[in-house]
Amino acid sequence: MTELLKTWLTQGPAGQQLISFNHHDIVTGSLFATQVYHLHQRLQARPEKRWLLACDSSDLFAVGLCAALLSGKQIILPANTQPGTLSELTQEFDAIVSDRPLCEGKIWLELKKELSLPHSPWPQMAEGDGFGELLLFTSGSSGQPKAVRKRLQQLDAEVSVLEQTFAAHLPHCSVIATVSHQHIYGLLFKILWPLAASRPFLSDLVEYPETLSYYTALFPNLCLISSPAQLSRLPDAVEHERQLHTPSLIFSSGGPLSLEAAQGVKRCYGSLPIEVYGSTETGGIGYRRQQSSDTPWQAFAPMELSNDSDGALLLRSPYLEDNGQYRCEDKVRLLGEGQFCLEGRLDRIVKIEEKRLSLVQMETLLNAHPWVTQSHLVLLENPRVQLGAAVELSTAGKAQLEAEGKLSINNALKAHLLSQFERVTLPRRWRYPQQLPLNAQGKLLKNDILELFDHD
């Protein structure tokens, strides 16, 4: 297998390689190398090994990522920069590389574009030095943030396979994304793969349909990195925007894409998006273009698939540490020739707006509120995917409900959850039964809880 990413990181970009762009600026390989060199020097002078990296601008993030990898540092990527999230991770990092201060009491190296720096070459690693590694934090099944370590060789294996699989469809393409680079999907598809394959990427996040239309009109060859939540809204969003060009390729990952959404994208742009199935732990496992609801997935070339007695997917992959085996919490039906169908989750990790969410973790935080005795969260899928919260209130909570009403309770509990969770992941529907439904063994009756949400 080629070492596309390692080769690029060792040699650095060509001086005239276009690294990134936005509507008013470009970053060339020469400028990028200079920025990486000077941050690398600052990191090398620091004894701290574990550096939290967070930055909204993708070109500055890439500077921080490359400098830290070449310095042999461990790079901590939080799921988000909410105060509660960073507080939970405070023992996991020693210092911060960011465009803004995030935590008091931690060493902070500021990421900023400095055009006055003297021209400098790409940093060279000393013989015997190793590349740094990444530590990504996701929602573990226990409800606590789970650390997922990624060595360069694992990321390199995936970048190389992506290039081998899709390069023929990406002639002279630029890359734009509606997803964050702080998560594994955006990190790979928006930052690492484009860098290694010399494809320029948009440094800003595409947040509005008119921005998408602007860049599709500007570039005849464009690759769009997106997610189901955003693609499902695309047909309505671009209905009144004349499309001069269409993306050469559209990727979707981070959660299931409905058949309706896939067909909607085809109506907009003339081709189906390529869905990528995987996780932070596994990287990409398979891909498909959804012609019908039962279109099977095709495993990427190096994957070895099997399943256990529960139907859970067992995976062997070079993207895993030591090329080991991993048990996924997805039930699958294997079809042969690397094809498979997904048949649902076996745990309580869900995706809300492509944000990976532990229901256990959110319930634990809810239950810590003085107005709550016990809570249970359910995923509601009609009329759209959203979270429902069934909450048994404490005596104080019931008094508040009686005095101030349901809306007051809703808002207070949402504010409580915002200390650790992003707003888009919060429950949209709330129920306050006198007691949560239990069976004789004290187990929650899920169907009875779902019935609480049958009527508004």
Please tell me what each predicted stretch does.
Residues 26-29, 133-160:
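Conserved AMP-binding A3 loop
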Residues 350, 390, 413-456:
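Conserved C-terminal "lid"/linker of ANL adenylate-forming enzymes
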Residues 6-7, 14-45, 150-153:
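Conserved AMP-binding/adenylate-forming core of the ANL superfamily
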Residues 331-425:
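AMP-binding/adenylate-forming catalytic core of the ANL superfamily
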Residues 3-16, 115, 119-137, 168-175:
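Conserved pre-ATP/AMP-binding loop-to-beta segment of ANL
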Residues 41-81, 173-181:
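Conserved AMP-binding/adenylate-forming
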Residues 237-293, 304-306:
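Gly/Ser/Thr-rich phosphate-binding loop
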Residues 157-174, 182-223:
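Conserved AMP-binding/adenylation subdomain of ANL enzymes
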